[in-house]
Amino acid sequence: MKRTLCLIATSCFVLFSAVSQSAFAVTLVPVGNRNVSQPGVPAASAKRTREMNTTYEAKYQKIYGLLKSDSKLRSKIASVSRTYGIDPVHVAGALIGEHTYNVDAYDRLQTYYVKAVSYLKQGLSFDYKGESIGDFVKRPQFAECNKFKDSLRLWSCRENVWDNNFRGNTIGGTSYPNNRLSAVFFQPFYAGQSFGLGQLSPLVALQMTDMVNRYSGLPKLDADHATEVYKTIMDPDLTLPYMAATLKHSIDVYRRVADLDISKNPGLTATLYNTGGADARARALANINAQRSANGESLQMPEENYYGWLVNEKVDQLKALF
């Protein structure tokens, strides 16, 4: 009798293990683009490019030229990528996308260092109508976020509270724009601006600061010290770890939440670097695939946007750099 029970228990364990491995198997997302032709480029990007009297191809060649000609920059990208356990082509892809579609690259890396120093001379602060972000997040609506100790979940929670309570509303006599928290509180120059070689927003830097502290040993950033935040995202030596951390997080969250490995597809990591919201996008795709699996359908793969599409098109050139 005991032997029979043992056999049954063993069989059940083997069956459970097989089911568990199947349920949690991670699928490698194929390399390359899912879309045959490039998805549409936003009108704002096209307008900026026309105003600068240039073309996307010219802008691509400019940032690619910077990467190709600056061996020190390539070395820094390779080094930081090793630290964060990602392929350097992910960092290069994010740089290519940002400087092709969002801004125009400077010809030399030294220009970014000069710009970083100039920011230290400006008395910057993160506030809205005289209320600092530090005071703003002490409001009772944000109390639920205090349980989070890591910077990513803390600031992500605060973003959600902003969207659900303040965005587009009038609270206590103060009207708040129907815009992102990042654009309202974290852009002292003009809304929607990102900065530096990696074109990071201050809010993303604040979200990633704990990971960067853990992996690179850089000091943690504080929203009450805006100048240091801007110095970090403007200085190439400091911003590269934040780029790598952001890309690593996208890879990690898709593996953990959606059971998808996007580490071999730099077009997808570039897309997420461009759009943000990797956590929410991974959850949405996981829900879609759970339903598809229940219906006996194949998995839906994540798709690149216009920005990531270019990266995958140019991936052989980018890989050759390293």
Task: Please identify what each model-predicted range represents.
Residues 63-74, 83-88, 106, 142-145, ...:
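Solvent-exposed, acidic/flexible segments
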Residues 148, 156-163, 176-180, 187-263, ...:
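Alpha-helical segment that forms one wall of the substrate-binding/catalytic cleft
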Residues 78, 88-95, 270, 274:
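Short, well-structured alpha-helical segments
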Residues 107-108, 113-131, 264-322:
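Catalytic and substrate-binding regions of cell-wall glycan-acting enzymes that process beta-1,4-linked
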Residues 24-78, 103-136, 228-235:
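N-terminal export signals and maturation junctions of secreted/periplasmic proteins
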Residues 88-95, 99-210, 224:
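Acidic/His-rich structured neighborhood in mature extracellular/periplasmic domains
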Residues 1-9:
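Bacterial N-terminal signal peptides that target proteins for export
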Residues 14-23:
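C-terminal segment of classical bacterial N-terminal signal peptides
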